Amino acid sequence: MAVAFNRDKPHCNIGTIGHVDHGKTSLATAITIVSSELSDGAVKVKNYDEIDSAPEERARGITIQTAHVEFISKKRHYALVDCPGHVDYIKNMITGASQTDGLILVVSGVDGVMPQTREHVLLAKQVGVPSIIVCINKIDQADPELLELIEMEVRELLTKYDFPGDTVPIIRCSALKAINGDSDAKKGILELMDAIDDYIPQPTRVLDQPFLMPIEDVFSILGRGTVVTGRIERGVIKVGDEVEIVGLRSTQKTICTGVEMFKKELDQGQAGDNVGILLRGIKREDVERGQVLAKPGTITPHCSFEAEVYVLTKEEGGRHTPFFQNYRPQFYCRTTDVTGEIALLSGKEMVMPGDHATLSVNLVAPIAMDQGLSFAIREGGKTIGAGKVSKIIK
C-alpha cells in the first residue's frame, strides 16, 4: 500500500543536461543523499544503478529513458528528470526537457564544454526551457585555474543561445565525493539546491482548465491494471474521474482508479505533477506514449492543420537550404513525434532558413490537438523549426 503524498511545499520539475559522462546521474544521486538527510528520510536515496535503469544503459553506462528522481529542498518538492546524455537519444531529451520548469547544465571541471554541452543548450533554447543553472562537476579532479576558464566558456555559451550567461549561478560540486560522504562536497550539493530554489522561478500552474496529461509511458501492474505516466499539463484529476485517451488511434473512455507520485498516493493530481494514473479496464496494448489523457469532450484528434512556423537559421542549428512543397519532416508535439507533409500557402515556392511562414500540415496519424498547440519540426536528427497550430482543418 502506498503512503499518502504530503503536499506542504510547491512542486517543481527540473532536469539535468550535459555531455555524456560529465556526471549528470551521479549528481542526481548526490542530490537525493543530501535531500534525504535534509528531510529526515522523507526522500529515498536513489543510487546510480536505480537511476541508470534501462538494461542497455547499464551496458554502456549511459542514461537512455528519462529517469525521474524525487528530492525535497528547503523551499520546494522536486521531480528531477535525468535527461539522456547520448547523442542517439536526443529524441528523449526533447520530450524530457520540454516537460521541465528549469534545467541544471552539468559540465565536467576536467573536460569543460564539449560538443553535446553545446547541443543540449541549443535544444534547451529550441524547446523553450525557461531557466538554466550550471553545476561544474568533478572539481576534485580539476585544475583550479582551468575552472575559471570553463566558467567563462559556459557563460559565453549560454549568452550565445539567449540565456542570461552573465548572471546565471554557477555552482562548483563534486558529486562523487558527496556520494562517498565528504562533508565539504555535500555543502556544495546543498549550495546547488539552494541556488535552484532561489533562481528557478516557481511556475504558475493552470489548475482551472480541463484536465490534460500527455502520456510518456505505460506500465502493467499485476493485480491492479494499467498505469500511464506523465506530467499533468493542465487541470486536476481525482480518483473516480472519467477520462478519455485521445490521439493516434480511436478515442477510448475509462475511469481513473488511482493517482500516485513517486510511489505515494495522491488524493488528486494537479498541473505540474509527474504522476502515474491507474486506468480501469484498459489493457497495456490499448494505450501508448504520445496519446493524451483528458477530461471527456475537451480535446479531439486531428491530422490536418494550419500553423505559424519559424524556420531556424544555419547559425541556430537549423537547415542550410530552403525547403519546398510536400516536404515531410517530423512534428514533435508533447510526447509524440509524427511525420507530416507540408503544403506551402499563398503561392510560396519555398521557405528559407530564418523565415516566418504560414503552412498547411497533414500528419500521417491523428494527434490530440487544440489551437495554439506548440510543436518542434525535426529532420535527420536536428531541429529545423518551431511553430504553433493556428487553425485546425480536420
Curated annotation (Swiss-Prot):
Region (G3): 82-85
Region spans: G5: 174-176
Keyword Secreted (UniProt): no
Predominant cellular place of this UniProt entry's protein: cytoplasm
GO molecular function terms attached to this record: GTP binding; GTPase activity; guanosine tetraphosphate binding; translation elongation factor activity
Residue span of region G1: 18-25
NCBIfam families noted in UniProt: EF-Tu, PRK00049.1, PRK12735.1, PRK12736.1, small_GTP
Subunit description: Monomer.
Name this polypeptide is given: Elongation factor Tu 1
Lineage summary: Bacteria, Pseudomonadati, Pseudomonadota, Alphaproteobacteria, Rickettsiales
